[in-house]
Structure formats: C-alpha cells, structure tokens
Amino acid sequence: IGGALGASPSAGLAQDAGVHSKEDVGKAFPAKPPYSPYAGRRYPERPYFGDEHVHTAWSVDAGGTGTTLGPEEATRFARGEELMATSGQPVKLGQPLDWVAITDHSDMMGMITEIKGGNPEMMADPTLKRWRDMFNGGPVEAKKAVMELVAAQSNRKLPPAATDPKFAKSVWAKNTTIAEKYNEPGRFSAFIGYEWTA
C-alpha cells in the first residue's frame, strides 16, 4: 500500500507551484460587483437644513404687523438658542439649523423699527410721525400704516427721510456684522442676504 501511494504528499502539489498569469488568476477569481456602491461618487450626500427666507422686525411687512425680533435674534434662534418670541413665550427649535439667510426687504430695511421707535430725525416728517402713531395704535391701525407705506413706496412717494442713503448704509453694515458674528464654518453658516423689493 505504501508503494501504491509511494510519492510524498507534496509531490502532487509541486506540479502546481509554477508562476500563474493575471489571466489565470482572473479565471480562478472572477471579478465581483463593487463592494461599496458609494465608492467613486463625487457629489454631496449630506443634506444641510436651513431657512432661506426669514423676515424680521427690520422688514416693513413683518415689523409693521407686530414682529419685534430682529436679525440677531432670528440668527440665534436658527442656531438653536432659546429666546422669547414676540408673544412673550419662550421658543426653541427642536433641532438647530445648519444655516440661515436673514432676508429682510432691501427697501427701507431697518427703517420700520426707527419709525415705530420715534427716531427724532424721522419724526420731523409729518407722514412718518403719523405712521408711527398708526403702528403703535393697535393691529388694525398698524395694518393700515403698512398698506399706506407700501403704496407710497410703490409710487415712489416715500418721504426723503425714509430713503436716506446714509441710514441704509448703516443698516447694511449692521446686517453684515450680525451674519459674520454668528457664522461658524463647519458648524453653522449665516449667509448675508436680503430680499430685493420689487
């Protein structure tokens, strides 16, 4: 029996010990579909959640109808901070946003808070003073003031104090400063923005 088996166990394997080509290996191990369907993808795959259209007390429509929170408060709210709403109640998002764009109206941005607050330079104009009284006279009067103001703006009949370029520049500087203050690359994006009033 030993003679029948005669050769050492490694003798049969020695014949297969030669060098194999890539083709031989390819036949022995055929190509498989990619293990990871994501390999080689070059497009973004993580959604970022934010708000691209936020009006604050600086816009005529929001500020004129009761909103008291400005761009800084709106940005802090988007970042997940708790604050007091216009209604006097505490508010906080269930999950912070990844980004926000505060987009108050371009025309008269920030002017409404100055009118409502009785800015002395603006109160020298009788129309702006009357609007201030209407804004502070309750929701019905405030809505009428907003409609008058929008009509005057649409017809290019706003008082000169309401279109002062120096004031507009100062408001825009505040707006950009707020966005830059809260922008944290990699954590939260605060975009500098506005809505073009047409």
Give names to the regions the model predicted.
Residues 1-2:
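Sec-dependent N-terminal signal peptides
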Residues 6-14:
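Boundary at the C-terminal end of the N-terminal hydrophobic targeting segment
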Residues 14-198:
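Extended, charged catalytic domains and RNA/DNA-binding interfaces, predominantly
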